[in-house]
Amino acid sequence: MSVAAAVSLALGTAQLAAAASARPMADASSARAANGASGGHAGAMIVPPSNMLQQIVVTASAEARNNLQTSEQVTTIPSKLIVAMAPRSIAEMLRLIPGVSVQDQAGSGGNANFTVRGLPVTTGGAPFVQIQEDGLPQVLFGDMNFGNNDYWTRFDVSEQMQATVGGSAATLAAGAPGAVINFISATGRHKSGEFTLSQGLGFGETKATFAVGGPINSTWRYHIDGFYVHGTGLRDQGFIGENGYQLKGNVTHDLAGHKGFIRLYAKLLNDREEYNAGGPVSAAGNGDTLSNISVYPGFDVRTGTTVGIYNQTITYLSNVSGQFGQARNDGIHPHVDSLGAELYYVPTGNLSVDDKFRVSKISGTFAAQFFGLGNTASVIGSTVNGQTVGQVVYAGGPNAGQAYNGLLNNSTQIYTNMHNMGNVVNDLSLQDHWRTPYGKLTAGGGIFYMSQTIDQSWHPNAQLQALSGTNPQSLDLISTTGQLLSSNGVTGYNTAWGASVDRRYNMNATDTAPYLDLTWGIDRLQLQGSVRQDDYRVTGWAESASAATTQVGYLSGGMLSATGGLGTPLVSYSTIDPNTYEPLDYGISYRSWSVGALYMLNSSTSVYVRASRGGKPNTDRNILSGYTNPNGSLNSSGAGKALDIVLQQEAGIKHEGDFLGGSYGVTLSYFHTSFSESSFDLTQPVATRYFNERYSANGGEFEATWAVGGFSLYTQATYQDPKVDSNEVGPSPSQLTSLGSGFLPPGMSKLMWVLAPTYRWRAVTGGLVWQGQSQQNIGGPVPFYSPAQDFLDGFVSYDLNRSISVALHVNNVFNSLGVGGGGAVTTGPGVVGVSAEPGRTVLASVTMKF
């Protein structure tokens, strides 16, 4: 978590209302009109009041209500100055949300694995969570291979982040039965301007962030924000690892007579961020549990990296043309150009119409050196490219040609080209309400449409490196007869995960989803229900290499041939086999629902219950798995694996009041979730790559704020008891074997918490953020547990005058060694391969307001 998160939390809670007063059920239409906000189910730009229970809920909500009067778990990271926050990745920011579990993080560019309420991340990404910007999803699926939803979003200059966990997320968003997280932009209602320049102290990052906006005249207003970042990054690769920008803006025309508004949006994102692949730690093992974790000599996972000056580029083999190319080994590099519009209109009375539209041109690349712990003893004597390995030597660098012994990184060097990940999305909704002798009835409904392209080509090379966290050198293999078996450490081009993972596909998924929401309220009681019908259509094609198109050859001068000498690298390689062509032409339909009831015990306390059912389609992760017929339709096996259903039940209490001269707000909830899944994870060993599993979880969430004078406190905690109810894995869908049940799912912890006190005295503000988690299963299908861990962050800021302030942020103050993950764990004698949290970083910044 970013230490500077406490800045925003402090600003949002430092001036809580002195006392709670009686409040009627919120009038949604008047709230929207007063704020010039969108009236749809997921994206109004409303600046919330400081008390967390009085913040207006607009995310996955058909009607704008304050949190106290909402029958589900909602968190809003307070508005104003999210721009002043300094999280090192989106993953650190999401840890502020109760119920959200961030299993690991791969750097500031995204690719984090995160989920909610004990639902497992079995394949990667965020399969149950939709990330939105201003009420519309960035991409249709949160767990696309090399296209997770956190690739395309940067949060530096959002006005606020709001999350709805469970409940209506199942019905008022696409494929998000777990949660909807919405990054909401400022819209220029108030004149403001701010520029921040930050500099890493001890690590290479310089970043400039700005935001400016305000009224143009009585009916027009605007907001523009953005950033530029440049440097070597948190983990010094020896070359520029961070370089990019985002520019985002909107202009709003308010209609006469408070009839609504018309708004235009634009966004440009071109940002290159380093990728953290993990590394080794020294540890003792006690059965399935790690202990005594410490830094492995030569590779500190807090600062080390698998990328350096000796592998700044990746040589890849086009799996279509068979020609070699060069790509920068530059982590995650997204390009997003978006244009959007919104019309919110109140034609008469209480009737409102809201239509949000956006078209996005999206592409990018993913380049990384993954980590897999191995040793020379297991490599020497093995068969590689048809010959027996006799020696391991340095491929280049200062030790070129010298023999290498000991542990090594035997993993995948991958370059994925995301040719086209663009989409078009539109959400049209209507709402009206009527007051009757029997209470107030609010009816809303609409239709959601989104078309998502997924066009990618993969190039996974098998590559070996020396085990070093600073400028690791590649390792070559030499056979017992003196034949060179690799080129700069690469033993195979496109062959790292087997021929079927050398793939090329171009597919399109559309979702057409009408939805309906009804709310009835009388006196202190509110009943709410919503239903959604999602109809997906998947078309396109996929193809891969095969054993028939996988061979060995001699590599010389960028050409492959059948003959060569001992000093010419003999490598394996694969290209696409046209006979693997798989047409895609099928539909997925399902119905989601959510029902809830809320009762106001008094003006400051509410209780609620809710149940929901939602779905998550599987699209690109199910291709080339034998799930389709020759005409592209789903066969009987594929029909059972194209959709996963999540069931949730929850109950909670929300309360606000006064304590010791200050004001507080607190929420407490209980939840139960259940889920089953059949899918495929290419990063697992071949023997456990396909799986069919069932899960369930019980748990509770707690969130509270308290403020008195210059002191404020934000805290949240989640306890969950997720279990694997059944667990079948195997090398193919027809070869599954049970591995048992009853254990903690991969990547999961039972307890997670955040405690963030802040104090302001005159011109000085300081604070701490303490966050941690209990024991975590960092293994794959076979459990392997890391110990509990916690981190302390701190910050201090000083106002030089009314316009200029300086700040110092320290993340991971004690440089704690924290490990995570949820994938395959590789082990050696006293050594374990893990993903890891970044070590201590210090960031200085200066902010000017104008």
For every predicted segment, state its role:
Residues 167, 179-215, 225-238, 769:
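Short strand-turn segments of transmembrane beta-barrel domains in outer membranes
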